[in-house]
Amino acid sequence: MQGSVTEFLKPRLVDIEQVSSTHAKVTLEPLERGFGHTLGNALRRILLSSMPGCAVTEVEIDGVLHEYSTKEGVQEDILEILLNLKGLAVRVQGKDEVILTLNKSGIGPVTAADIIHDGDVEIVKPQHVICHLTDETASISMRIKVQRGRGYVPASARIHSEEDERPIGRLLVDACYSPVERIAYNVEAARVEQRTDLDKLVIEMETNGTIDPEEAIRRAATILAEQLEAFVDLRDVRQPEVKEEKPEFDPILLRPVDDLELTVRSANCLKAEAIHYIGDLVQRTEVELLKTPNLGKKSLTEIKDVLASRGLSLGMRLENWPPASIADE
């Protein structure tokens, strides 16, 4: 076995034993010692609690106002019917919510095959029994809401949020969205050349038929990898660059008007009006400057030309002027 002593072995998919369409065993090896339990436990938790799927969330049965009742001509009570609907395996394409209907009369079992649905919905186990009608005159009609979700959401978690708008007779069902019904893993010994301290991970799982077991493991591994991406990217995190704060005002506005090299007459007129900085000057208008004693149109034109050469003009508005550095002087 070649490679550095610090280099980790990469597992490969050794075998997929398809016990049935809903039951499979997946074997991965070789894994470094301890990694069998590390990966097996992580995948098991994701498969049980975080896999998306579809489940029955609400039911309306004609003639039934609450779940603690019975219906004439039906063998099961309403609670048992809701429990049977909870086990309904449904696959929905392209929608997050669908409404299914069921109408059945006459003696005999009522199964998932009796549910009316469109082409976007597939009932995976049509033989699944919902209830039994015990009389030739008995009948049952219901509307079944199926929604897409993740994990397990009890009806009690939705009661308070929907109480005000939920009409009487609409029965909430504990929603088990996960398509995985059973998952277990086992860690066995593995060997590569002279190394005998390695792990072999065997994952055994059963689904409700809405997803292939192999695909379920693939999705769980994808979820785990996506959650770990943030830790992988830690190596690329760089210290944020300290950006220099931009000055509040253009530095030229903080310079004295003497830097404009105006004629003595114009400079003296500005000083007489307490205009000491270029920032003070650009805030004045032509009308205001013409009111300055001894400052005529010739001086005004000179000032405008000098400011224009520096990309400035009269009548500018400067918020928060003067800055603290000038105000304190």
Swiss-Prot record:
Query: InterPro entries given for it?
Result: DNA-dir_RNA_pol_insert, DNA-dir_RNA_pol_RpoA/D/Rpb3, DNA-dir_RpoA, RBP11-like, RNAP_asu_C, RNApol_insert_sf
Region of interest called Alpha C-terminal domain (alpha-CTD), as start-end residue ranges on this chain: 249-329
* Example of a GO biological process term: DNA-templated transcription
Q: Signal peptide position in this chain?
A: none
Keyword flag Transferase: yes
Q: Does the keyword section mention Transferase?
A: yes
* UniProt GO MF annotations: DNA binding; DNA-directed RNA polymerase activity; protein dimerization activity
Q: Which chemical reaction does it catalyze?
A: RNA(n) + a ribonucleoside 5'-triphosphate = RNA(n+1) + diphosphate
Q: Where is this region: Alpha N-terminal domain (alpha-NTD)?
A: 1-235
| CDD domains from the UniProt entry | RNAP_alpha_NTD
Q: Which domain of life is it from?
A: Bacteria
Which Pfam family, just one, is annotated for this protein? RNA_pol_A_CTD
Q: Which UniProt keywords apply?
A: DNA-directed RNA polymerase, Nucleotidyltransferase, Transcription, Transferase
Q: What is its EC number?
A: 2.7.7.6
CC terms in the record's Gene Ontology section: cytoplasm; DNA-directed RNA polymerase complex
Q: Which family does it belong to?
A: Belongs to the RNA polymerase alpha chain family.
Subunit info here reads:
Homodimer. The RNAP catalytic core consists of 2 alpha, 1 beta, 1 beta' and 1 omega subunit. When a sigma factor is associated with the core the holoenzyme is formed, which can initiate transcription.
Q: What does this protein do?
A: DNA-dependent RNA polymerase catalyzes the transcription of DNA into RNA using the four ribonucleoside triphosphates as substrates.
According to the UniProt entry, the note on domains is: The N-terminal domain is essential for RNAP assembly and basal transcription, whereas the C-terminal domain is involved in interaction with transcriptional regulators and with upstream promoter elements.
According to UniProt, the name of this protein is DNA-directed RNA polymerase subunit alpha
What organism is recorded for this protein?
Photorhabdus laumondii subsp. laumondii (strain DSM 15139 / CIP 105565 / TT01) (Photorhabdus luminescens subsp. laumondii)
